Curated annotation (Swiss-Prot):
<comment type="pathway">
    <text>Cofactor biosynthesis; biotin biosynthesis; biotin from 7,8-diaminononanoate: step 2/2.</text>
</comment>
<keyword id="KW-0001">2Fe-2S</keyword>
<feature type="binding site">
    <location>
        <position position="128"/>
    </location>
    <ligand>
        <name>[2Fe-2S] cluster</name>
    </ligand>
</feature>
<feature type="binding site">
    <location>
        <position position="260"/>
    </location>
    <ligand>
        <name>[2Fe-2S] cluster</name>
    </ligand>
</feature>
<feature type="binding site">
    <location>
        <position position="60"/>
    </location>
    <ligand>
        <name>[4Fe-4S] cluster</name>
    </ligand>
</feature>
<comment type="similarity">
    <text>Belongs to the radical SAM superfamily. Biotin synthase family.</text>
</comment>
<comment type="function">
    <text>Catalyzes the conversion of dethiobiotin (DTB) to biotin by the insertion of a sulfur atom into dethiobiotin via a radical-based mechanism.</text>
</comment>
<feature type="binding site">
    <location>
        <position position="188"/>
    </location>
    <ligand>
        <name>[2Fe-2S] cluster</name>
    </ligand>
</feature>
<dbReference type="Pfam" id="PF04055">
    <property type="entry name" value="Radical_SAM"/>
</dbReference>
<dbReference type="InterPro" id="IPR002684">
    <property type="entry name" value="Biotin_synth/BioAB"/>
</dbReference>
<protein>
    <recommendedName>
        <fullName>Biotin synthase</fullName>
        <ecNumber>2.8.1.6</ecNumber>
    </recommendedName>
</protein>
<dbReference type="GO" id="GO:0005506">
    <property type="term" value="F:iron ion binding"/>
</dbReference>
<feature type="binding site">
    <location>
        <position position="53"/>
    </location>
    <ligand>
        <name>[4Fe-4S] cluster</name>
    </ligand>
</feature>
<keyword id="KW-0408">Iron</keyword>
<dbReference type="InterPro" id="IPR006638">
    <property type="entry name" value="Elp3/MiaA/NifB-like_rSAM"/>
</dbReference>
<feature type="domain" description="Radical SAM core">
    <location>
        <begin position="38"/>
        <end position="262"/>
    </location>
</feature>
<dbReference type="InterPro" id="IPR024177">
    <property type="entry name" value="Biotin_synthase"/>
</dbReference>
Amino acid sequence: MTLRNDWTREEIQALYEQPFLDLVFKAQQVHREHFTANTIQVSTLLSIKTGKCPEDCKYCSQSAHYDSKLEAEKRIAVEKVISEAKAAKDSGSSRFCMGAAWRNPHERDMPYVLEMVREVKALGMETCMTLGMLNQSQAERLKDAGLDYYNHNLDTSRKYYSHIISTRTFDDRLNTLDYVRQAGMKVCSGGIVGLGESREDRIGLLHELATLPIHPESVPINMLVPIEGTPLADVEKLDVIEWIRTIAVARIIMPHSYIRLSAGRESLSDSDQALAFMAGANSLFSGDKLLTTPNAGEGKDQALFNKLGLTAEKPKPTVSDLSVDAMSA
């Protein structure tokens, strides 16, 4: 399938409106054109600083604006992070993602995160961080330290965005993605479904992602996990079939991207997840927790992989890895 960055909303809507089985069949065909069948990229996500975030994202337990009963934690020691990364690698994860509840990293935090990137990279894992907004200098320093991916989700459509967040703009998010690209890192960016948005908004989110100059290498499709104390605690749950439709459309319009199952997966049955894989999802977060929300544990994931005949993808060597190998040869 030809890679395109000029998808129209009307084309994306037409995909959504296909009969479900036709849509999933098409998505699986596209998936097999560009990826190895029955192989899933596995990532582990660790919170390196939890809670007291100044942003007001209405879905988030870490926001200081809401009483979610979350116990805030200061930055954890680099040694603890490395220990967790080693355990993740031993459990089959090829990528280790580190997240901090910041609006943006302060300069005093940069030596801390840069050391962390270098140490995790030395383990032979792909590295990813989500630290909030970045400026160009910070993006370049993260790249120089060995960061492979930077996550910064768009969350929802531009139209619906102001219903969810007021403390940073949609364009703030796009600017950070631009800095990440300019620095030479790979982009991880997706969104959350089930925020009370309409299908039109889900179309809008995918349209924004699929018309970026370069598609994100990873596209997380989160399902809202309602958290007591947040404004979205009682929002009506999105139908799983609609979530899978979103995954299938994302696969078709961004054929080279990894489509990741992220938050909300712990509430899904094995059959739901199998359908999501059939619809083109080929990445997931493993482990008992995603930052502050529960997640399917590693044991459950391995049991599911065994049941479905899936295997975990091995880390891909980066340009810097190949350069080191050449120097040592």
